Amino acid sequence: MAAQRNRSKESKDCSGLVLLCLFFGIPWEAGARQISYSIPEELEKGSFVGNISKDLGLAPRELAERGVRIVSRGRTQLFSLNPRSGSLITAGRIDREELCAQSARCVVSFNILVEDRVKLFGIEIEVTDINDNAPKFQAENLDVKINENVAAGMRFPLPEAIDPDVGVNSLQSYQLSPNKHFSLRVQSRANGVKYPELVLEHSLDREEEAIHHLVLTASDGGDPLRSGTVLVSVTVFDANDNAPVFTLPEYRVSVPENLPVGTQLLTVTATDRDEGANGEVTYSFRKLPDTQLLKFQLNKYTGEIKISENLDYEETGFYEIEIQAEDGGAYLATAKVLITVEDVNDNSPELTITSLFSPVTEDSPLGTVVALLNVHDLDSEQNGQVTCSILAYLPFKLEKSIDSYYRLVIHRALDREQVSSYNITVTATDGGSPPLSTEAHFMLQVADINDNPPTFSQVSYFTYIPENNARGASIFSVTALDPDSKENAQIIYSLAEDTIQGVPLSSYISINSDTGVLYALRSFDYEQFHELQMQVTASDSGDPPLSSNVSLSLFVLDQNDNAPEILYPALPTDGSTGVELAPRSAEPGYLVTKVVAVDRDSGQNAWLSYRLLKASEPGLFAVGEHTGEVRTARALLDRDALKQSLVVAVQDHGQPPLSATVTLTVAVADSIPQVLADLGSFESPANSETSDLTLYLVVAVAAVSCVFLAFVIVLLAHRLRRWHKSRLLQASGGGLTGVSGSHFVGVDGVRAFLQTYSHEVSLTADSRKSHLIFPQPNYADTLISQESCEKNDPLSLLDDSKFPIEDTPLVPQAPPNTDWRFSQAQRPGTSGSQNGDDTGTWPNNQFDTEMLQAMILASASEAADGSSTLGGGAGTMGLSARYGPQFTLQHVPDYRQNVYIPGSNATLTNAAGKRDGKAPAGGNGNKKKSGKKEKK
């Protein structure tokens, strides 16, 4: 701490000195000269490094006077100045390996400041390496395992030694202790690092020597030489190259004739020098007559021979049995067992349980005493010699203690989860002839420890939950079992911390820590995510607690919560309806347009079907159930109205199903000139001024009364003429001549409908001028038609163009519909305050304006029956490309229903047949005459 404070003070003094020099303009000289020294590492503190006063050209006494001191940064000061001798000395022990690791050159740099000159001198001290480190292995012992039958020449890698020194002082060589089986080979890597390998020179014999002890020595090249060692233990694995050998070639035993069945007579033992399965010996009888085979039982694993039937001395007093021993590799050995049957004995042993230590914990070490037994037999000599035994499958064994006491000790590890208590039977048998025995029974309880973690019934779980579920709803239940008891088996459930789309999992799911029931904390949305992955942890309450995890996959099921969305025709913001063009010559099945819709749901909830919900002319059009294609169901007739209104419904297959509707307007005409001609055939009131309205009404009533008869005659003549021309047109095949094929809508799906042109006809409420709007193209949203034309081409109607006229019923004039009037913002020209939409353009020359005025004013008288249906809007009319450029479906204002004739009760309806509940008369875009007008 003191050194740190000194360095901090020196740093502050130096910083202040530098600032002072800068303030007074004193020049700062640095790096004028570099002074170099070289010292070996591990010098003692105060060792001489160099004469700094001499190298600086100063006397030793001037060092203090001139304020000469060492300036260093960020490192513990390794050197200091001796002001009396003027020499540079070490400030402490210098360890090159600590400073520079194994770098080839180790240099310590710092500066010396002469304060009165404000001058810095660079000092560079090279620390040279000495051989102060011996090579060292990471471990003191190394185990190498080699199979007994490995061929000579096999190589085995050995660990490398580490020497932090460099150059000749670093690791140079390896040596192996002398032996007759192995040699050492030293290899070098690409970076020059040497590593040793153990090479087998001669074959091994595990039975001769199972473990070979070798010493590997690593040496450096320093002076003095240093080295490090590691003990290498080579364990030889066994191969089956030895046959079993009995401990005795012949076994003899004498037994009383009254021995009980199951009494063990003797145990034969054969040994095999091999290990593992090669050394496991099994026993069997060989060449034993059937009569003798029933008398004895041989344990094939232990070699124990027991009585399986009562012996009879009078029947047979001697048995000669041949036993065969076989190892796992089919090597055999045989031995003889000679059994002599004898007589005598009358007292049974007495067995007493002196002490019982119950319960015993299941983690008790082997050899723990659980009971102390005392045995006694009143007989003498051999008949009074008592032996105790227990069943072989029990994890206990009996050990003889002093005098006649036995200890029952743990022989194999206990597991309370497998057996929680043992009913132990101890049998005491004397050595009489026949032997007598006594049994003692007692119960030993095993106490539990927390040695088993909770286990789930499945490796992983998955469950399903419908979306839009109620908050707090139960989702699923997981169950874990712990075979321990009491608090060691009390399970606590929890969820592992995780995030879903940046939100903690705990905000979506919670779990009951006692029951394992999972609850939804919020309503899930299938469209947000389909699946949740989580980890459930089950921990017991033991000390220390144990736990286990299981993965749970929660799948969100889709519900029909999204209605279909209409993509085409798109609904514009101004409330207009798209208009499609169907030529009069269209055959049945002609593709008029296509309704395109999508559903955000999935599966069956997203399957869409289309149907025609409503049509102004039933039976004229049909909608594809699965494609949404609107096609003609029959050939178009002359009586079919110019404007057809269709309502198409799109419905999904969810439960309950959701639907959406779209209204389509179809103009029945062959081309734009024909549509405009039909519009031009309407007549409009001659005057909209209201100042002389009363006079005009009187004149109008008188005029109507006078010309009524003449009108009827002219109308009949005109109808006859139209009927005559209609017959001529039908005879000519109804073909359209002189019109390019590119002037019609394509039938290749939605793309064709997007490559059409729309037109607007707007009538103002305050002006008698009519305008034909040619919307500007929106090249960002639409496709460009291959056939284009000039937007400013004049639109002309031939004077001699004549159209057949259908019978037009006389309908009473309906009052105006107030909600069809234009707002002030929608009125074009000088009548309105502004244009309602900047996507359309008004006529830009006097000719266009006057022509359209004349056409619309001429048709005003026919507006009352609502059959004038020419309109535009957000959809397309599918008209010829020569009358306007391509434009976006959604960006065209819709004025087709917003028609109001000033000074008149005449209005235009939105769809044919919607006005006053009467069906309109229409046909082939023909000119129509209005009926008799009503007075206000």
UniProtKB/Swiss-Prot annotation:
Q: What is its biological role?
A: Potential calcium-dependent cell-adhesion protein. May be involved in the establishment and maintenance of specific neuronal connections in the brain.
Localization, per the record, is: Cell membrane
Please list the residues annotated as glycosylated. N51, N423, N549
Residues spanning the signal sequence? 1-32
Cite the SMART domains for this sequence: CA (SM00112)
User: Membrane spanning segments where?
Assistant: 697-717
Taxonomic superkingdom: Eukaryota
PROSITE patterns this protein is in? CADHERIN_1, CADHERIN_2
Keywords attached to this Swiss-Prot or TrEMBL record, sorted alphabetically, are:
Calcium, Cell adhesion, Cell membrane, Glycoprotein, Membrane, Repeat, Signal, Transmembrane, Transmembrane helix
* Basic residues compositional bias, start-end: 926-936
A Gene Ontology molecular-function term? Answer: calcium ion binding
Q: Cite the Cadherin domain residue spans from the record.
A: 33-137, 138-246, 247-351, 352-456, 457-566, 574-687
Primary location group: membrane
Disordered: region residues: 806-845, 906-936
How would you describe this protein's topology in the membrane? Single-pass type I membrane protein
Q: What is this protein called?
A: Protocadherin gamma-A10
Q: Which InterPro entries match?
A: Cadherin-like_dom, Cadherin-like_sf, Cadherin_C, Cadherin_CBD, Cadherin_CS, Cadherin_N, Protocadherin/Cadherin-CA
Spans within the Extracellular topological domain:
33-696
Chain ranges on the Cytoplasmic side, renumbered to this chain: 718-936
- Coiled coil spans: none
Query: Compositional bias of type Polar residues: which residue ranges?
Result: 820-845
Q: Name one GO biological process term.
A: cell adhesion
Q: Choose one Gene Ontology CC annotation of this protein and give it.
A: plasma membrane
